Amino acid sequence: MKPNITILKPNPTITEMFQYCNAPLKNTRWSWGAVSVNNDIFLRVWENELAVIEEKRFYRVTHLAVYKDKMSHPGIRERLDHVERICSGSPSFMIKCRAKNPKAIPREFKYFDVSHIGVGGKLIDIEGDKWLEQKNIINLKNN
């Protein structure tokens, strides 16, 4: 289940990273994830939106309270589609991102971890939002 990812330069942009995953973003401004040519789902997740439950790591993949009045936003609609695909069995992967200010809404992107991606596991519900288990990590430095 390891995706075929080849990093072509040492410090790619987040847009290039999705391209390297064979999952180009639909829109570089509002897309938070993408579907690969193999129907794998690649999602941006924020490194600080982590819940550890029974020694398992879960990252928030929906934040509906923030978007309750903006459900027509193309980014949230696309994210909900990605979550539905994961619920239906599509393999999923997470690109962990850091915000300049983790408390700001909307957040400004600072950087992402180009050396690893998380392998998604089960989705759980925490207070109305979906959180995706990170069941493994793929080291991209050796690809």
Where do the protein language model's features map onto the residues?
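Short helix-coil boundary/hinge micro-motifs
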Residues: 1-142
